[in-house]
Amino acid sequence: NIGHFERLDGGNGDTLDVVEVIDWDTQGDTDWGPYGGAVNADGDLWTSGRGPGPLVFIDGDTLVYDRWETPPETSPYGITADANGHPWMGDWNGGLLHFDPTTETWDIIDTPNTSRGRGIMIDRNGFAWMASNNPCALVKADTATRTLIRDDIELPGCGTPVGISIDAEGFVWVPDQDASVAFKVH
């Protein structure tokens, strides 16, 4: 029932710091431990569990952590941080999740045309891009207004898109585990 985190030296792999988050699963129903992470511009780590949360913030300087339960009936999957350092997550149960650490409130953004949020990343223009299943599609949301733009961007021939990456030119890449391809979207 402990979330274990290690910060490694990028040059040689040595362990620099260790943080253990006690009571990782206070509800006794999390079937996944820490599941992904995102580092904000200040070097702090956001991470979450699946089935449900928690959401955890680890300060990159002090290594002190804060912990919040995710909203009921949600199951965070992918995670990223926006320009304000706030975490955004794909929701395995459908939709996107945003957490405001100042107000300690959640935004749940529904995706009515697709039901399984997966990997997520935010581009330099502040748009969140999320892979989604059931049916497979690409989702686009505006992080400034916290609103859905589209949840039905087609990926012709897709099977199970699982992740998102954005290259230096701003192209969105969507790897698909069943189709064994990566889609390039602008």
What is the role of each PLM region?
Residues 9-14, 58-63, 99-104, 142-146, ...:
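Short loop/turn segments that connect beta-strands within beta-propeller blades
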Residues 19-30, 68-73, 108-114, 152-157:
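Surface loop/turn motifs at the tips and blade-to-blade linkers of beta-strand repeat domains
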Residues 1, 6, 44-48, 86-90, ...:
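Conserved beta-propeller blade signature
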Residues 30-39, 73-83, 114-124, 158-169:
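Repeated scaffold domains used in trafficking and secretory/extracellular systems
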Residues 45, 79, 87, 96, ...:
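Fold-core signature of tandem repeat domains
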Residues 162-186:
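Blade-level signature of beta-propeller repeat domains, shared across WD40, Kelch, NHL, RCC1
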